[in-house]
Amino acid sequence: TYALFVDPEGALFGVLKSDSGDPLDSEVAIGDFFWMDLFAREPSKAGQFYQQVAGYEISKGEVKEGVERVVLTSHDKSRAGVVPLPEDANRAGWLPYVRVADVDATLKKVTTAGGYVMVPPTPELLESNLAIFVDPQGGVLGIVRWDEPQADKE
């Protein structure tokens, strides 16, 4: 059973109840969804909303380039980040990231298939290599090369 909702900042999110329960935490393999970031006008307030609705604990993540990240955690695991929405963005939204072996090779496949690169490879973010692209239908996805097994993500 699942349902879709819109949070107070306009970000679409869904909830799911599986008949088999939640999956166990495991290492993130190449091709697996790796992380989620919510881009919000007021990250602290957005974090509080998800704390009230989904029971997440809130912690402050590392500040990079003057930007403070809110981290949503459960069962002592970091689950998602909440970061400031770019000033030129229209509304809040969630951005999923997928773990890849090679960011540059993946972006070549993206452009060959008709997508375009929104944020070029950026090694400074997440202390790894990260890029964001848009597919031909307008879907936005982040990709990350992560060399170490993920025990916890912040």
Mark where each language-model region is.
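Active-site pocket scaffolds in enzymes
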Residues: 118-122, 130
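Core segments of cupin and vicinal oxygen chelate
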Residues: 3-4, 38-78, 105, 112, ...
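N-terminal beta-strand motif that seeds the catalytic metal site of vicinal oxygen chelate
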Residues: 16-48, 53-59, 93-96, 145-154
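Conserved short beta-strand elements that form part of the metal-binding/catalytic scaffold
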Residues: 6-19, 57-93, 101, 136, ...
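Short loop/turn motifs that cap or connect beta-strands within the blades
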Residues: 85, 122-123
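Vicinal oxygen chelate
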Residues: 1-6, 33-41, 85-111, 129-134
